[in-house]
Amino acid sequence: MSSFLQKQAVKSPTLLRAVIWALGIIQIGSSMKFKKIITLIVTHLSVGTFGVALGIYILPILIAPTPLTVAEVTKISSQAQYSATFKKDLKDSDSFHWGEGLVSISSEFITLTGSLAPGPDYKLYLSTEFVETEIDFNRLKTDMVLVGDVKTFENFVVKVPQDIYLPRYNTVIVWCETFGEFITSAKYQ
């Protein structure tokens, strides 16, 4: 190993030494130019970042429970007092944050016969005002009630806590708690 690389490895922070070692740069010797080292570090870190981002998107899909069938959801939603429709064309909905389908609301369950864009940590809220943007959601969140977790991205059923009085609210919202992203909403009264 060249004396230049030895000196750099001693001076460098631990993380940089680990990256240099992991890339095999130390074994290559002095023939490698500094620009090439930086290029390799940047490209490898970029690929790693892409992999983590892809994992964040795919992991919820892989660990999601099996969704209920349309017949099962229809049976549960037969006692619904209200219904609404999730649509893809809301202001803050996009190709990664959307929902579509029939939402049925009863004092026991809120169901969706349809699908949501996959993502982590989805929560179902009720609001006294219609919401279709992250700004509106954050502004009104203190007046909303959390119903529960949405665990599937197709045909979900969420149990409604007994202390929630449905006529007080008029909008059902799916929100990604981890990333603070609006997914979808529908006004049911």
Language-model regions: role of each:
Residues 39-57:
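Hydrophobic membrane-insertion alpha-helices, especially the h-region
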Residues 57-107, 138-142:
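Transition segment at domain starts
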Residues 102-121:
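Short, surface-exposed binding/anchoring microloops in extracellular/periplasmic proteins
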Residues 123-125:
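Beta-strand signatures of extracellular beta-sandwich domains
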Residues 134-162:
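An anionic, turn-rich surface loop/hairpin at beta-sheet edges
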Residues 161-184:
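Short, exposed beta-strand-loop hairpins at the edges of beta-sheets
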